[in-house]
């Protein structure tokens, strides 16, 4: 029976690849169904012989308890956005300062959810959401129900790949029809539907909704020397890669492609929101490197956002965690990019003056970055009142005088005891990119603050399970989960805490970079400004902000209290050791290693202070080679780069 089951699995997986990946099926649907039913019968009779790559894994229902957090071995960066031809020209100019004759590759920007797939010895072991780029959620069981994701690869590879999971428009229409018939609210757009589906705890629901994927990158160090070759390699492994792409030598060719895609956009079977432009050569990518937040070798051109007219009804003014007072417009409801919009940001007081926005104006509304509703401009021909908007002079939260500094565009409350600032700081501290305390969202924080149970972030760690039961709507099970989530967050690596403190100019990526160098928040608090400013990608503004923060008595007390409650202040990731053997060197691994796994070799190099990259460039300092090193060894020799073997690495 085992032989027949092997034959059926191999056949069915081949036919599935032909159907979903190649769009060239060699058998009829009825023949596929017949073979599938035969396999199901055999697996029912011999459950102990079910194979790991059996296609039946995709349809079985399983109710999950939840999604565990998963640390990405290779971080997922955001891309810099571009909204005009001029911004693309500026990107090209920056690239050409480092790379003389770049070739670009242009790919469609799929409007879906970023995913990371990890295979060990060719078997899918982890499917993870993007999350904050460093930590995502393990949704492996759900992604196994996406029919075009291979459960096994044709080679026994250890590899991590990146892509987008999306809902095709046809599937979206079918899902919404079913929801309508069942009296359920319809999804606003395919992206929301895909997101909601991947968050399902019942995997059978995922299997029914016909999600799909496009893969676009090998995240683990690539064995190919260009993005285009990497995409072709992904296709060879059985992944679906979007065929709509071009290689371009200049911005004129890129702009023509963007215009062509823009005209075809509405006729595609899936949603896109732009075009991603990357430097094709991976060695050139290594030369260009990264900013703190994004690669310097790529940009995402976003199509112009949909615009609608709405009438301004009133303006609300709210205080953020840094004291900035932000105006929000209340509008007559309009449908915009698949959702109903009745509120939109007015950015700041200077923006209101610049756009001359007045009471009862008709305004143009759009979604900035296809996400945040914003007022773009006034329709002056429809103006009905000359009366200017009322600009507040006192903080809407604490009634302190508001200040408008000469070098700032916004009004600001500088009262350190302002309730709104404290509460927003607590919300930020618990948020996903900071301490990531599951369940401790704005509504719970507001209730805790109103009940005087928390006044600063250290108070969060003094809460007991019974404290949550004092809050309206919180039951015993929820209270237990909240308490457990708070306790679990104590073990976070310290960059999460540093970002959570809300220090001005210190975002999540900067926090990680700082802790890689200083290893703990206590060390960082003692560092001088010159030492901080000398770190690559940082500078004087960040250094001064840190110095100002840590110089206050309040910060010293807060860190002491956090430590006393058991919150970790140390960095748990790979640190940069200033005096390590390979400190500051850029190293490439190539060829087949005999004794070390590639991941082990990479970890060892990084522990010795090296930066491990996938491509050889003029910035490469050292190449560690195994058997069958091939073209990378040849290129290293041509460039005069130092070459070492596995035995040398083991001896360090």
From Swiss-Prot:
Protein name listed in UniProt: DNA ligase
Binding site for Zn(2+): 395, 398, 413, 418
Residue span, BRCT domain: 577-652
TM annotation in the entry: none
Catalysis: reaction(s): NAD(+) + (deoxyribonucleotide)n-3'-hydroxyl + 5'-phospho-(deoxyribonucleotide)m = (deoxyribonucleotide)n+m + AMP + beta-nicotinamide D-nucleotide
GO CC field: cytosol
InterPro entries for this protein: BRCT_dom (IPR001357), BRCT_dom_sf (IPR036420), DisA/LigA_HHH (IPR041663), DNA_ligase (IPR001679), DNA_ligase_AS (IPR018239), DNA_ligase_CS (IPR033136), DNAligase_adenylation (IPR013839), DNAligase_N (IPR013840)
Chain's role: DNA ligase that catalyzes the formation of phosphodiester linkages between 5'-phosphoryl and 3'-hydroxyl groups in double-stranded DNA using NAD as a coenzyme and as the energy source for the reaction. It is essential for DNA replication and repair of damaged DNA.
EC number, UniProt record: 6.5.1.2
PANTHER family listed in its UniProt record: CHROMOSOME TRANSMISSION FIDELITY FACTOR 18, DNA LIGASE
Gene3D superfamilies, A to Z: 5' to 3' exonuclease, C-terminal subdomain (1.10.150.20), 6.20.10.30, BRCT domain (3.40.50.10190), DNA ligase/mRNA capping enzyme (3.30.470.30), Helix hairpin bin (1.10.287.610), Nucleic acid-binding proteins (2.40.50.140)
UniProt record, GO biological process: DNA repair; DNA replication
Binding sites annotated in the UniProt record for NAD(+): 29-33, 78-79, 107, 130, 164, 278, 302
Keyword Cell wall biogenesis/degradation: no
Cofactor annotation: Mg(2+); Mn(2+)
Uppermost EC category: ligase
Recorded family membership: Belongs to the NAD-dependent DNA ligase family. LigA subfamily.
Source organism, top-level taxon: Bacteria
GO MF, any single term: metal ion binding
Keyword Cell wall biogenesis/degradation: no
